Amino acid sequence: MITKLKPYLQMTLTLEQMVAAGMHFGHQARKWNPKMKPFIYAQKDSIHIIDLISTYTHLNEASKFLTDSVSIGQKILFVGTKKQVSQLIAKAALECDSFYVNGKWLGGQLTNWQTIKLSIQKLKSLETKERHGLLGKIPKKEAALLKKEKEKLGKYLDGIKNMASIPDIVIIIGQSEEINAVRECKKLGIRTITILDTDCDPSLADLFIPANDDSISSIKLLLGEFVTAIKKGQQNFAEKLLLSSDLKKQIKKQRSRR
């Protein structure tokens, strides 16, 4: 059993689950990126088969990194705009109180953050006006235009509207589709964790998991492990804050007795 690999975390993922999810199926051999060769187990019927031992090992490493990072208060952004994964991305991010982009990556979403923040402020303003019924007090044509603008902004910014600053770590599903996000992270020095299929470039990712990035079942399993790792980190962070708060109270109490 693959679970004998001494995972960093108490991962429940097994080899059987990974195989059942089709996590080992890569792309057609003719479409491969030679840099992925160390993570390919074999070729069958012109399809590359990913080495699941490598997948598991890299997932352990990424999970530990996530937990350690979130334990010190770092924030995570999930990115995945492919139609088949967009809802999975939002669900995973919301489940672990993180941020997400699942509609379209806007140019400069991170590198031009100050401009994006203005758009977020506009979205929040429109949502507030609608919530308080203010749009019903202006001409219908003008109200319709504002509602349309709100919906457009919400489509792209809903997942990051509560993100106060650029994230510390970005989890990317679909390197080819999210290459602009990859480049912006590289430019800003933001660490990335990427699910890499056999046609991807591992040199563009800080940490990566060799795995099928098209299968919904495969992505669900991997996102589930990310969420677990993040939640563990959040629990650690909350406990540290509580201990710090208790310590401050004790010090204050001792000083008041002097």
UniProtKB/Swiss-Prot annotation:
SUPFAM superfamilies: Ribosomal protein S2. One of its GO terms (biological process) is translation. It is found in: Plastid, Chloroplast. The keyword Ribosomal protein applies. GO terms for cellular component: chloroplast; mitochondrial small ribosomal subunit. Keywords: Chloroplast, Plastid, Ribonucleoprotein, Ribosomal protein. One of its GO terms (molecular function) is structural constituent of ribosome. CDD domains: RPS2. Its main location: plastid. Gene3D superfamilies: Glucose-6-phosphate isomerase like protein, domain 1, Helix hairpin bin. Belongs to the universal ribosomal protein uS2 family. PANTHER family: 30S RIBOSOMAL PROTEIN S2 PROKARYOTIC AND ORGANELLAR, SMALL RIBOSOMAL SUBUNIT PROTEIN US2M. NCBIfam families: rpsB_bact. This is Small ribosomal subunit protein uS2c. The gene is rps2.
